[in-house]
Amino acid sequence: MTRIPTPLDCVQNIAPYQPGKPIEELARELSLDPTSIVKLASNENPLGCSEAVAQEVSKELNEVARYPDGSGYKLKNQLSSKLGISPDNLILGNGSNDILEMAAIAFLDHDRSAIYSEFCFVVNKLATQSRAAYGIEVPSIDYGHDLERMRDAIQTDTRIIFISNPNNPTGT
């Protein structure tokens, strides 16, 4: 009999992500015309892709079957020049989730803690939990970060303090 391996407990305890409802589903539920709904959830642009972006993407269509430069050499060098910092001080990722998860992989484990605010971006908690690290949730002030209490929550095992700005879901 083949046994399927089970994930670590810290991963099994993560609740599945619940994305926002598609416009079509919401329209059916509420008997609305889908064109009357503007979806502002799920970090989606209700205006769609700009013509300038569409033109630039179309120029690169022949390259989509190839892996991109994983090091981001050109982008890092352009950002380096613009920001006046070394390319070695830049980390690129596929959105904030990717970068936050990379930080958790690099700095967290079961013997370490991370600090984040109540009502923080959900990935801060998920990245901490996925590493079996101890999460220290600091109560918010008017849905914002209480920086003094976050500072006071630092322990000898704290390796990451997540301060999201702007913060999803509060916008602070």
Language-model-derived ranges and their functions:
Residues 130-135:
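A short helix-loop-beta submotif of the ANL/AMP-binding
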Residues 141-172:
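Active-site phosphate-binding strand-loop segment of PLP-dependent enzymes
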Residues 39, 92, 116, 137-139:
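Structural signal for conserved beta-strand scaffold positions within catalytic alpha/beta enzyme cores
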Residues 2-97, 102:
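N-terminal small-domain helix-loop-helix segment of the aminotransferase-like
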Residues 43-45, 96-97, 121, 165-169:
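Short glycine-rich anion-binding loops that position phosphate/pyrophosphate groups of nucleotides
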Residues 106-127, 138:
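Conserved PLP-anchoring active-site segment centered on the Schiff-base-forming lysine
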